Amino acid sequence: MHERYVPADVEAAAQGDWRAADAYKTQEDAQKPKFYCVSMLPYPSGKLHMGHVRNYTINDVMYRYLRMNGYNVLMPMGWDAFGMPAENAAMANGVPPAKWTYDNIDYMKGQMQSMGLAIDWSREIATCKPDYYKWNQWLFLKMLEKGIAYKKTGTVNWDPVDQTVLANEQVIDGRGWRSGALVEKREIPMYYLRITQYADELLNDLDGLGWPERVKIMQQNWIGKSFGVNFGFPYELDGEKQLLRVFTTRADTIMGVTFCAIAAEHPLATRLAQGKPELQAFIDECKRGGVAEADMATMEKKGVATGFSVTHPLTGEPVEVWIGNYVLMSYGEGAVMGVPGHDERDFAFAKKYGLPIKQVIAAEGHTYSLDAWQEWYGDKDIAVCINSGKYDGLGYAAAVDAVAADLKAGGFGDKQVTWRLRDWGISRQRYWGTPIPIIHCPSCGDVPVPEKDLPVVLPEDLVPDGSGNPLAKSEAFLNCTCPKCGAAAKRETDTMDTFVDSSWYFSRYTAPDAETMVDARTDYWMPMDQYIGGIEHAILHLLYSRFWTKVMRDLGLVKFGEPAKNLLTQGMVLNETYYREDAAGKKTWYNPADVTVTHDDKGRPVGATLNADGQPVVLGGIEKMSKSKNNGVDPQVLIDQYGADTARLFTMFAAPPEQQLEWSGAGVEGASRFLRRVWSFGYANREALASRAGFDAAALGDADKALRREIYSVLKQADFDYQRLQYNTVVSAAMKMLNAIDGAKGATPGVLREAYGVLLRVLYPVVPHVTYELWKALGYADEFGPLLDAPWPKVDEAALEQAEIELVLQVNGKVRGALKVAKDASREAIEAAALADDAFAKFGEGKPAKKIVVVPGRLVNIVV
């Protein structure tokens, strides 16, 4: 054992042992309870960031603690390897996305291994490998057979210069990110998955999940079950009688309708624009720009009057029709009723264009004004109908019932449940993704690729140039034979949304070598007992993976309907930001490592200068680590300087897993200092610790008893905190233990050895390298086996027993001392001891006690 703690040597030695023993290879074991813990698989972007380090360390701590407690634990890892960033990098570097991706995987895997993570690498998957995405294609074809997958036209962002489809994030201020051309909305054929078929189940099954409440609420809102009325405004056009259908949850305000707005893509808009250049120009404008719902929500609301009116179904009055850029054709009916008196968006629209505003609900104690919107205008819970004829005086529910009944009687509509959730469009006009297994035949139409011909392999040698999909230009990929008629045909060149790849990878981990999509091993491990990932995945990934799991269940592939029993969303890692701003307002951000900060006498930052030139920089505050703010910390630099255990210890100690973590260089140094203390104590006391000296618990002296009592008391709390996933307080407990051991003057070698052995096991899940090596060097491994499989220490309840307890002594409610009494002392004995104590003689001022309050096990208060 070396005198000095050298992290690089310690970690290399421990990892060498683990590799030699294949320590983390896991098999199914019916004799043990299983625990399957999974970190969301990373995108191979090039390097790990501190968010990765935190996520994987949380998982690793969980793995090691549960393995010590007798569980059969599995922690796998893989790579979410398809996606647009690889294409962008390929264009920038002139290399195929495959090379960029595989190089990054190699580097990041090495980083993970240097962290000492308990990953079973025999189960590693990369979603860009044919043996994985074959099953994306296979399940897609099964869904096609069952009608869950289908084809229809969908709206995309089209760059007319690059002749390519753009993702929403590639549209910047309405223009293509590369070409700068005005983006158009275009309708193209796409494949969809019928997730709406599972809407009720997706909503109801949230109740049984051990997921954070805010994640459940986000999914509930995204699924968006709404109870309302679907009805139509009648109109006649070119001799045809039709209904302009809308859906509303506020049928109680129907008498306040003063206009209707329709989407630019609505069939009525197309017909009304014929021969009207100004209408067509506005429709074309609406079709440019992004199609993301978030963009639609924040952009300026614009509209154009069509000059056409529909008829109010209950009053018979004409209602003017407008085309609005805020109306989504993909949501509801592509048309909305405008009630500016009681809808904030409609109110702003009406004020902008001078449309009538009519009040049709009132609330006691509130005054209505047309001048400015007030929140209560849209509050259905306090609303009573006014100016609504026969509905006057009705509250929300009664008014909706009455209006719905009248609309139904007139043949205009009825009550309806609708969903915000839309079917999942999986077609992407991109190269680096799972090929959609469809062949286009001039005679037979769209023909599914036969199962025997799967996978449709994506060529890995193409280099995208930004002008269209490379697959459409690859004759070798494109040209094929129709499996039905044998004629020359073309392959589908769209690839699948990368959320498909991440919707079931956790099931493939359980059977990575299976010749079927999954097998019996999947039902052993799944569902995941713990899933760990960022809150940013709360909706799409987590919702799609739940849907995919239910489809697999319904196809008889698995026996479970939810992918994860429990979810932990770890907090973001934050760091200080520093910048300079030029005359044009452009900010240049500087990494905290390149900045020197000055503090006031209370330790608060008051200024900062750039090390390169000594000139001031602006303190930008604490924000999430990101490339854009240049405030990240490279985990590899941290590991090279301090060791993986220090990085792990700091990330676990600085904050509870679900809370934000503020980066602190001083905190990292403190973590390193603590590990040096643990090592130094072991080295300084190596003879006593390695002595294997035993002891008779009944014959121990006070110093030994006190140390054992403290160690086991803290162990009990640490065990509880491990179970609650509160790893920051586990580290606090270990620090208390070390202080107790270090300060235990007069403790005998046997008790010291026991206490230090408990400390090593408590710390091991958090800092496995240093504890593993100390355990081995000090002879614990010879006695109890390697720390990898050493059992979790059991609390010796007898050691917690005390002959005496200490009570707080108060006089007139103020703490004046402490009182030692027998643990089983009677109330009378406690009162007598309190009155006899020097503190009462000193602070009682010679007065007799009026009353003595005894709180058992805590305090005595003498009132004079």
From Swiss-Prot:
Enzyme class: ligase
Entry's transmembrane regions: none
GO cellular component, one term: cytosol
Pfam families assigned: Anticodon_1, tRNA-synt_1, tRNA-synt_1_2, tRNA-synt_1g
Keyword check for Protein biosynthesis: yes
Family that this chain belongs to: Belongs to the class-I aminoacyl-tRNA synthetase family.
Protein name, per record: Leucine--tRNA ligase
